[in-house]
């Protein structure tokens, strides 16, 4: 069941509830206006002309901060994992469904300020809005307290979920990509060696994967097989998989 969205005296309500919101976040804002702004959806200001800012700029910033923090974490935690597989794991951790999980686990969606039309929408748009809210909160914390504050918030609250995703066995990316291409293009993907370097006993291959004259992804590895898997994983990081 979707949460009930509060709409009577909404800005004042969020301001009054700031301590409760901060307790759930585990972070206290120096500038409370950033906290309030994170909860203002564009549809709300369309119906409340006295409000002239919404959370999309914070969402834009938070998206980049979240991606950087997850990339840094994966790079340090998985030093031997190829680039393509890192890209796939990052996409799993920052995709909309993960962001929705993050925000729902904090039980903050009831404070979100929406216009009447969005409040009445019980479709998929709500998930997108909740994911945007999470990114806006990340952006607000980053602006208020810096990168370390955003990092502390993310990993203090969601480290367990991140570890569960990382513990999921890595898939056969080539087989998955082949199935995807056959289903959507009725063709199998083609792999092309772009570059190889290093001595014979320590080669590094860079390979791209193509479908219908369109490059889908690239990957590196110490063998062609490993590089192909990395390229397939990179390609799959850009599409939705079940």
From Swiss-Prot:
It is found in: Cytoplasm. Homodimer. It catalyses: Endonucleolytic cleavage to 5'-phosphomonoester. One of its GO terms (biological process) is regulation of gene expression. Digests double-stranded RNA. Involved in the processing of primary rRNA transcript to yield the immediate precursors to the large and small rRNAs (23S and 16S). Processes some mRNAs, and tRNAs when they are encoded in the rRNA operon. Processes pre-crRNA and tracrRNA of type II CRISPR loci if present in the organism. Gene3D superfamilies: 3.30.160.20, Ribonuclease III domain. InterPro entries: dsRBD_dom (IPR014720), RNase_III (IPR011907), RNase_III_dom (IPR000999), RNase_III_sf (IPR036389). It is an enzyme of class 3 (hydrolase). Residues 172-241 form the DRBM domain. It comes from Protochlamydia amoebophila (strain UWE25). Its EC number is 3.1.26.3. Pfam families: dsrm (PF00035), Ribonucleas_3_3 (PF14622). Its cofactor is Mg(2+). Residues 18-146 form the RNase III domain. Residues 218-227 have a biased composition (Basic and acidic residues). This is Ribonuclease 3. SMART domains: DSRM, RIBOc. Keywords: Cytoplasm, Endonuclease, Hydrolase, Magnesium, Metal-binding, mRNA processing, Nuclease, RNA-binding, rRNA processing, rRNA-binding, tRNA processing. One of its GO terms (cellular component) is cytoplasm.
């Amino acid at each position: 069941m979707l949460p009930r969205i509060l709409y009577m005296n909404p800005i004042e309500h969020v301001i009054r509830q700031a301590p409760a919101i901060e307790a759930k976040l585990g972070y206290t804002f120096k500038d409370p206006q950033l906290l309030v702004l994170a909860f203002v959806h564009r549809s709300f200001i369309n119906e409340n002309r006295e409000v002239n800012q919404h959370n999309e700029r914070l969402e834009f910033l938070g998206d980049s901060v979240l991606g950087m923090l997850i990339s840094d974490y994966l790079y340090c935690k998985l030093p031997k994992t190829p680039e393509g597989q890192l890209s796939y794991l990052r996409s799993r951790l920052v995709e909309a469904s993960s962001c929705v999980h993050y925000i729902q686990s904090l039980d903050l969606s009831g404070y979100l300020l929406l216009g009447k039309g969005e409040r009445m929408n019980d479709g998929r748009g709500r998930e997108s809005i909740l994911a945007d809210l999470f990114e806006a909160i990340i952006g607000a914390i980053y602006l208020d307290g810096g990168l370390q504050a955003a990092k502390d918030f993310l990993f203090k609250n969601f480290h367990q979920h991140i570890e569960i995703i990382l513990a999921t066995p890595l898939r056969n990316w080539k087989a998955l990509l082949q199935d995807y291409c056959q289903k959507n293009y009725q063709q199998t993907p083609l792999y092309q060696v772009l570059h190889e370097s290093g001595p014979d006993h320590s080669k590094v291959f860079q390979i791209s994967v193509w479908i219908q004259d369109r490059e889908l992804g690239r990957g590196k590895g110490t063998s062609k097989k490993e590089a192909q898997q990395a390229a397939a994983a990179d390609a799959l990081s850009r599409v939705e998989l079940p």
